[in-house]
Amino acid sequence: MAVVTIKNLLESGVHFGHQVRRWDPRMKKYIFAERNGIHIIDLQKTITAIREAYDMVRRTVSSGKSVLFVGTKKQSQQTIAKEAQRCGMFYVTNRWLGGMLTNFSTIRKSLSRLKKIERMEIDGTFEHLSKKEVASLRKEHAKLEKNLGGIKEMKELPGVVFIIDTRKETIAIREARRVGIPIVAVVDTNCNPEGIDYPIPGNDDAIRAISLFTQLIANAVMEAGNEHGLKIIENLQDEESGDELDESVSLHEEGREITDYENYTPPEEREYSVNDEGDVFDEDESLYEGR
């Protein structure tokens, strides 16, 4: 198993929870202490949870099943896409479309449409269409790619769903539970760990914490087919620190990436709206128009 230590977790700010007044009492068993109005997460329990989740993901992938990485909030999008691609798995970073798991047959139609448009452009079909028709097809392709590009090659339901921010991804969690797919998720002190098969207590806002957790799950996937093992997390994080972060992520959001809790003030909690679980379309138009 890839190495992860308390030091790794501390350096990534994994131990920082939310303000005490924002806590979910169901997270009580994962909380070590309270300092200056901030809950501190018990990292020994985080280590244990990581090991359990890591082993489960590795076993699942070894059995021939896939992992779906889900993280649609701004801090997680870049890392989720990067790590899922690194280990050859699927991901959702734009928004979760209702029915991605519970109505996968409809989603597959959208995926087929996406691939059909790509083939049309490659095989020269576009050359025989009007500019208006080509523009319409490219617009449709861009929309499908944005929403479904990360699962383009997903032929069947995944064996595991890995989630960053359970409060935001409520529909994904509900769908996974409905179809019986095990859920691995990072749960912060303001989250409800119930219903999560493999909850990992930790900071789900800091970019470095998100990166660490996602790297570990990607490593588990890769180790399933790598008898020689992988690089330790310290080296992976050195590589990550050299990457340029998305400038659209504010410094305020990165503020949780400190190790001195006395100077730490978490960002105000965001409220997330939940779309209709059965809505497999955007609010204003169909995913695959004109058919």
UniProtKB/Swiss-Prot annotation:
One of its GO terms (cellular component) is cytosolic small ribosomal subunit. Residues 238-291 are annotated as: Disordered. GO terms for biological process: translation. The keyword Lipid metabolism does not apply. Residues 249-259 have a biased composition (Basic and acidic residues). One of its GO terms (molecular function) is structural constituent of ribosome. Keywords: Ribonucleoprotein, Ribosomal protein. Pfam families: Ribosomal_S2 (PF00318). PROSITE patterns: RIBOSOMAL_S2_1, RIBOSOMAL_S2_2. Residues 238-247, 274-291 have a biased composition (Acidic residues). Belongs to the universal ribosomal protein uS2 family. HAMAP family: Ribosomal_uS2_B. This is Small ribosomal subunit protein uS2.
